Each structure stands twice: as C-alpha cells, then as structure tokens.
C-alpha cells in the first residue's frame, strides 16, 4: 500500500517516537513517565517526538481532557516536533486503508449478529475452546454490501508473532491465540488497534514506548503492519508504577495527575527528575539535569520491574530544586502559587529575596507561598501556643526597647538589626531568647520563622515597628 505521510519525513531521522494519550482523563504520572521516556529516547538519538491524541472513544473523550494533557506536557516542557494529531480527524484515511484491505483480501466484512456471536462463544466455552471468531462470514456472499456489518482483519492462522521488546526482551505469541480483530465498527468508525497501526505507519514511528498493559495489543498490531507491508517499529513496554504499598498507583496514594503536583507546589524539574528514576538509573546518581538525562538515557536500560512511588523522595528532590535552581526561575513558578492563595506579592520584598530565606524549611512552593504571608500581609492573629509562652507581661519591656532602638536605625540592614537585638538583651540582662521569641511572634504571628534579623529586614522598618507596637498593645489587653 502507498505510504501517505502527514508531514515531510526526513529520511535521515533514525528515531521518531510518539506519545499517544487518550483524552478520557487527566495526564497521570504513569503517562507522564511514558511521555518522558519517549521524549528522552528521541532527543538522545537526535530524533523527533510526535504528540498524538487518540480520541476514537467518542463517548469518553472530552475537550477538557485534551486541554489538560496539553497543559501537562507544556508544564513539563516536553516539546513535540509534530502534532498534536487527532485520530478523529483521520477517519477518512483509516477507512481508505480498510477499503483497500478488503479489496486485497486482507480484511473482510462480518455480518454476524450479536446473538450468533454469543451462541458461538457459549458453545466454545462448553467445549473448553478458546473463544474466537470462526470466520463464518469470510466466504459469505449472500449479504448485500450495505447490510449492517463490521470489518475484521484476516489474521494469520499459522506461525508466531515474534518481537524483541527493548525493555522485556524476546516475546513470542502463536497466531492461533489471536482472533480476527474488528477494525471497523457497524457505525463505520475504525477501532483503536487499527488506528494506532495506520498512525504509526503514516507518521514514520520507529520506536513505540508505552505501558506494559499494551503488550497484548502488540502482536495484533504487528500482524496488521505486516499485511500492509509497513515497517515494524521497535516496541518498549515499561512497567507500571505502584504506590509505596505495592498496589497500583491510584488516588488513594495521593495526587496522580501531573497538574495536581503543580497545584501542590512541585517544580516540573523535580517531577521530571523523579519520574526518570522510576525505572531507569545511572549508577547511584539521583540528581539529573535535563541535559544529563538526554545524554545518558537509553530505553534498553529501563527496568522490567514495577516501580514504587515514594512521595517523600519527591519532596526531597523538590526542595533540592527550590534551593538549587536560579532563584528567578523558581520565583516565576512561585508567582502562580502566590496568586492562588490571594497574596499580593507586589506589596513587600521581591520573591527572589524570600525564596532563599524560606526554602530551608519548605519542601514545596505551596508551603513557601503560605509561609510568606507575613512578608506581604498584616499580622491579624497570633499563634495561641506561642502567645501563651512568649507574650507574657515581661515581654513588654524587651519589645518596647526593640521598637525604640529599631526606630533610631538609619540603615535598615541585617547586621544592624542583629546588633539591636544583642544590645537589647545585654541592657536588660536577659537571654537572646527573651528578646527574639516575642520579637518573632510580634512580626510574623508565628512561633517559628527564619532568623529574625533577616525576617525583619525583609518585612521592612515601618511594618516591623508597627507590628511590635501592635503586639505590646495586644499583651496589655490580655493582662488587664
């Protein structure tokens, strides 16, 4: 059959991979890892990456799911050279190939009713036979062409299908185990397994990276490709991702959607780094830049074993990237979280200033955004436990002394603020804790925060002094 590419295929491209999600839900972490492996293998081999949306399930596919998949891919920065292509826009092409297959005797119309097929299955089960179509319609000519029918692929009945899976090694399946697959439904729509074959053929896909749940589809697809005279791609079926309890990853293990991880405050660099390690590695190395992944990744090195998703490990990686990426890059992502939590970050220090200060305690950008409120918003409430411990009447004197000395500062620096705290403790003959803890609670409303000299510097002089005075007034009201 004549190859009809969708785009000008570069004959020098030795590797062309694809990611082909179905838009029936969000982009989950398993799909994201498959996309990543496929993308990395293409980049490692100076190849091309194709994005295809397999939306033949008209009842379950939604525009919202398509948008979510595209958003997830863009957030992960997995750019594609070709696409996105939609199967629903290619029905004419699929049916053209099916009609040619019928003409060439590679496929045939099947007019069997549901009742006949159910009776056939029941009879085969009673006789301990594997349920399969008996080719009753293969040589039938009594039905009019326009009578309701499906189209079946005429699968070979002898021999075996053998392929060398890049992850799992040699896989061999007898053709006697395979049925005559329906490739076009009664309503005229082509079926998933057939669309995939034509797409991979038309798009010049050389390597198919996908989940192990597709292994059973592979021999059927290979037989169709052979019938069409099309090249057979290399297949790589990666294992599932389990939760840390060994069960298949699901919502009960926490977030499973890529964009949920964005919402929870994870950086795309952290999630990408974590996903690549779920089944692949390079020695004991844990941290990989994108450039290192591209240079080192090999699909043949991916493990056959299922991987366990460990949220604590992801959090560790995320904190690493928050602290090690250029602060301006992290700030760009943090802006989204600040807006989501209603924090006007234009009214205070630059985000690039607070990130190094808060990242020692925060593992996610969500935590960082929430922890930053006191830099931008007035303190309206105090932590109750901290109040009981640090806002006793004797805290008034060090707070008042602090306010007096801080007001006199002409140069609002970390060093000068620290010196004021030390002088206050010395003059009142008290420990630094008796100064620092009430000071912290007054300025942040919290019992814990970064060092108070740095915190006060970022909060600003006027706000700091105002909050100290508010705290003194609060202590008076509590002890009337």
From Swiss-Prot:
Cofactor dependency: Zn(2+)
Motif window: 'KMSKS' region: 248-252
PROSITE patterns: AA_TRNA_LIGASE_I (PS00178)
Residues annotated as binding ATP: 251
Binding-site list for Zn(2+): 110, 112, 137, 139
One Pfam family, short name: tRNA-synt_1c
Catalytic reactions on record: tRNA(Glu) + L-glutamate + ATP = L-glutamyl-tRNA(Glu) + AMP + diphosphate
Subcellular localization: Cytoplasm
Listed GO biological process terms: glutamyl-tRNA aminoacylation
Gene Ontology annotations for the cellular component aspect, listed alphabetically: cytosol
Co-factor binding details: Binds 1 zinc ion per subunit.
Keywords: Aminoacyl-tRNA synthetase, ATP-binding, Cytoplasm, Ligase, Metal-binding, Nucleotide-binding, Protein biosynthesis, Zinc
EC number: 6.1.1.17
Assembly behavior: Monomer.
Function summary: Catalyzes the attachment of glutamate to tRNA(Glu) in a two-step reaction: glutamate is first activated by ATP to form Glu-AMP and then transferred to the acceptor end of tRNA(Glu).
Protein name (database record): Glutamate--tRNA ligase
Organism: Histophilus somni (strain 2336) (Haemophilus somnus)
Gene giving rise to this polypeptide: gltX
């Amino acid at each position: 059959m004549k190859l009809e590419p969708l785009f000008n295929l570069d004959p020098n491209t030795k590797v062309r991979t694809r990611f082909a999600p179905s838009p029936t839900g969000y982009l989950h972490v398993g799909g994201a890892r498959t996309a990543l492996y496929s993308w990395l293998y293409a980049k490692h081999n100076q190849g091309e990456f194709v994005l295809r949306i397999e939306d033949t399930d008209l009842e379950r596919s939604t525009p919202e799911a398509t948008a979510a998949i595209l958003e997830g891919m863009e957030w992960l920065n997995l750019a594609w050279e070709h696409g996105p292509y939609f199967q629903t826009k290619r029905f004419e092409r699929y049916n053209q190939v099916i009609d040619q297959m019928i003409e060439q005797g590679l496929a045939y119309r099947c007019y069997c009713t549901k009742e006949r097929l159910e009776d056939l299955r029941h009879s085969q089960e009673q006789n301990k036979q594997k349920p399969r179509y008996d080719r009753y319609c293969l040589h039938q000519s009594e039905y009019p062409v326009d009578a309701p029918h499906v189209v079946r692929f005429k699968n070979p009945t002898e021999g075996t299908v053998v392929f060398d899976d890049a992850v799992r090694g040699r896989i061999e399946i007898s053709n006697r185990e395979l049925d005559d697959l329906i490739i076009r439904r009664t309503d005229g729509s082509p079926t998933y397994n057939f669309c995939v074959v034509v797409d991979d053929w038309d798009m010049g896909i050389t390597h198919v990276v996908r989940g192990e749940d597709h292994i059973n589809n592979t021999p059927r697809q290979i037989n169709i490709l052979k019938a069409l005279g099309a090249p057979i791609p290399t297949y790589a079926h990666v294992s599932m991702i389990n939760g840390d309890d060994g069960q298949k990853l699901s919502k009960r293990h926490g977030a499973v959607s890529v964009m949920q991880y964005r919402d929870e405050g994870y950086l795309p660099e952290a999630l990408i780094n974590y996903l690549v390690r779920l089944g692949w590695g390079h020695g004991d190395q844990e941290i990989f830049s994108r450039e290192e992944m591209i240079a080192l990744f090999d699909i043949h090195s991916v493990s056959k074993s299922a991987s366990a998703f460990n949220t604590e490990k992801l959090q560790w990686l995320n904190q690493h990237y928050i602290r090690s990426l250029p602060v301006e890059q992290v700030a760009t992502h943090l802006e989204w979280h600040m807006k989501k939590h209603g924090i006007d970050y234009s009214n205070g220090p630059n985000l690039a200033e607070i990130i190094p200060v808060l990242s020692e305690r925060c593992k996610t950008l969500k935590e960082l955004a929430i922890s930053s409120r006191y830099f931008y918003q007035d303190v309206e409430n105090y932590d109750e436990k901290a109040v009981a411990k640090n806002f006793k009447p004797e805290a008034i004197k060090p707070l008042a002394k602090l306010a007096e000395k801080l007001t006199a500062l002409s140069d609002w620096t970390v060093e000068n603020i620290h010196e004021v705290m030390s002088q206050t403790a010395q003059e009142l003959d008290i420990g630094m804790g008796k100064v620092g803890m009430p000071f912290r609670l007054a300025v942040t409303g919290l019992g814990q925060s970064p060092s108070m000299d740095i915190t006060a510097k970022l909060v600003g002089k006027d706000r700091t002094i105002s909050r100290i005075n508010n705290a003194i007034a609060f202590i008076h009201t509590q002890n009337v």
